[in-house]
Amino acid sequence: MERIGIFVGSFDPFTIGHDSIVRRALPLFDRLVIGVGVNEKKRYMLTAEERVEAIRGLYDGEEKISVEQYSDLTVDFAQRHGAQFIVKGVRSVKDFEFEREQADINRRLTGIETVVFYALPGMDSVSSSVGRELKNFGRDVDSFLPKRIG
């Protein structure tokens, strides 16, 4: 059976923390689908298409990775792809508590498991919101965003 994981988020923008999770998760799966979430209630710096294309460009040539947008429940997105696992990254206790609760809900709904990766040392302050803020003020974002995205 093919091991399929999904890694989802708004990725506005995709950070070095997100990239770290993808690269660390990749050896565990035969396929990893990156889902770029679209929520009509949120305002974005980048369009969904721009986010998808930026992430695709980052993993160009990586056959195990696909990237697409979605706007439904994460578990429904996972089921569409035949995924058995949802990949999540956590930076703090607050993140962990939220993701633990989401994992329980997802497991109850579909039986899908959640695989958690902890932020590497020094990456706990890396976030899309910090990357956006720095970029808006014209500051250097190299220590927050991958070179091909920043």
In which residue ranges do the predicted regions lie?
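Nucleotidyltransferase catalytic core that binds NTPs
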Residues: 1-150
